[in-house]
C-alpha cells in the first residue's frame, strides 16, 4: 500500500469514527436532557449518567477532530536515511521470530488499524514508547523496548 492511499484511508476511517461518535454524543445529550430523565429522588441517576456519557463522547469527538485535522494537513515525506525514521514514514519491523509488523508513524490516531491480514497497517505516534524508539532509526537498526519487564527486540527492515 502506498502512503498516499494509506493517508486517504486513515482520513476516511477518522471521518467515519467522527460521524459515529457525533451521533452517539447527540443521543446521549438528548437522553441527559429529556424531561422523563429528570431525577425524582437522589437514587434516580439516569440523567446524570447520560450527561457523563455525553461529556465523555464529546471529549472523544474532539480528540478525533484533532487527529482528523492533523492528517488533513500532514505533508507526506519520503524516508530519508540521513534523518532516519520520522512522522509520516511507513515502517516494517521484524521480531526475532521473523514476525513482521507494518507501522505508520503518524501525528495522531494511535492504535488505528487499516487493512487486514499481513497487509494491515497499525498507526503509532511519537508519544508511544515504540514511536519514540523508532524516531531517527534507520533500515537495519535494532529497536529494543522493555514492556512489563520483558525486552522486545525488533529490526527495521523497511522504511518509506
Which residues are covered by each model-predicted region?
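N-terminal intrinsically disordered, low-complexity, charge/repeat-rich segments that act as generic
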Residues: 1-82
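Non-DNA-binding regulatory cores of transcription-related proteins
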Residues: 81-146
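Short, charged beta-turn/beta-strand-edge "cap" motif at the junction between a beta-strand
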Residues: 97-98, 144-160
Amino acid at each position: 500500500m502506498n502512503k498516499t492511499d494509506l493517508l486517504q484511508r486513515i482520513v476516511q476511517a477518522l471521518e467515519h469514527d467522527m460521524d459515529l461518535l457525533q451521533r452517539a454524543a447527540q443521543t446521549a445529550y438528548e437522553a441527559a436532557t429529556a424531561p422523563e430523565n429528570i431525577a425524582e429522588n437522589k437514587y434516580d441517576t439516569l440523567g446524570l449518567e447520560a450527561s457523563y456519557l455525553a461529556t465523555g463522547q464529546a471529549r472523544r469527538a474532539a480528540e478525533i477532530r484533532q487527529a482528523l485535522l492533523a492528517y488533513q494537513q500532514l505533508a507526506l515525506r519520503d524516508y530519508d536515511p540521513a534523518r532516519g525514521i520520522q512522522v509520516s514514514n511507513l515502517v516494517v519491523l521484524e521480531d526475532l521470530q521473523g514476525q513482521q509488523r507494518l507501522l505508520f508513524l503518524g501525528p495522531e490516531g494511535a492504535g488505528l488499524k487499516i487493512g487486514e491480514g499481513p497487509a494491515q497497517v497499525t498507526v503509532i505516534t511519537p508519544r508511544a514508547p515504540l514511536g519514540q524508539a523508532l524516531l531517527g532509526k534507520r533500515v537495519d537498526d535494532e529497536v529494543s523496548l522493555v514492556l512489563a519487564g520483558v525486552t522486545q527486540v525488533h529490526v527495521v527492515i523497511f522504511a518509506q
